[in-house]
Amino acid sequence: MGLLRIPLYRLYERRLERALSNAPKPRHVGVILDGNRRWARLSGLSSPKEGHRAGAEKIFELLDWCDEVGVQVVTLWLLSTDNLARPPEELEPLFEIIENTVRRLCNEGRRVNPMGALDLLPASTAQVMKEAGTTTERNPGLLVNVAVGYGGRREIADAVRSLLLEEAAKGTTLEELAERLDLDDIAKHLYTRGQPDPDLLIRTSGEQRLSGFLLWQSAHSEFYFCEVFWPAFRKIDFLRALRSYSVRQRRFGC
């Protein structure tokens, strides 16, 4: 960033902050952290790992920005179930970065909720995720959902499976369950059970699709698609997303 652009950037940032001071803000923000590999390639870096590492650092900036505006829940989609099919030479360093990121979240006192098919992850990564959820569950402040090995359809299937097992343990027959089953019964078994549904979903890198992110929970969410790659995501990009959200008239229907 040039010397002239730095003060202009700060002025614009403060202008956005003033405009948002009394505006409605989301309680729950979901973010698809997209574009790490493309950012690394366009930046002339030697491997995708460098993009993933830069993207991991950006997470901590985002959480600070969320703290500043009073967001209560952030859901971060770090790795999808589809991504698990990538070559081992890319996944191995990525899992290491994810483990280090989750440990740092714990060390900084964040409340971490692991989301995803942990049984599909390497044992060490799954263990780090599980321990984070257990050791930080009573931490105050911002709740950070960390989605690794996550897929929206898989989450719904897991929720239904969990519900069926719970009801079977009570002796409920399938006919009895089918008779009284409603949406809340399934929602109580989602990875985000007990949390508010996301108000705002952000995807970086210019892709304009959700790819199944929070498929059940996003029925009434507002979407914001940002052109920049995740490692280059700035505070003004976040504030612009909040500004866009603040002027929308939310309709909880068609």
Curated annotation (Swiss-Prot):
Effect of I59F: No detectable transferase activity detected
Identification of the protein by name: (2Z,6E)-farnesyl diphosphate synthase
Family: Belongs to the UPP synthase family. Z-FPP synthase subfamily.
MF (Gene Ontology): ditrans,polycis-polyprenyl diphosphate synthase [(2E,6E)-farnesyl diphosphate specific] activity; magnesium ion binding; Z-farnesyl diphosphate synthase activity
Protein purpose: Catalyzes the condensation of only one isopentenyl pyrophosphate (IPP) unit in the cis configuration to E-geranyl diphosphate (E-GPP) generating the 15 carbon product (2Z,6E)-farnesyl diphosphate (Z-FPP or EZ-FPP). Only geranyl diphosphate (GPP) can be used as isoprenyl acceptor.
Gene Ontology CC annotation, any one: plasma membrane
Species the sequence originates in: Thermobifida fusca (strain YX)
Effect of I59A: Able to incorporate E-GPP, Z-FPP, and Z,E,E-geranylgeranyl diphosphate (Z,E,E-GGPP) as the allylic substrates. Changes in the product chain-lengths
E.C. no: 2.5.1.68
Residues reported to bind Mg(2+): D34, E222
Essential cofactor(s): Mg(2+)
Keywords, in A-Z order: Magnesium, Metal-binding, Transferase
Active site per UniProt: D34, N83 (proton acceptor)
Record's keyword annotation contains Transmembrane helix: no
Enzyme class, first EC level, given as a word: transferase
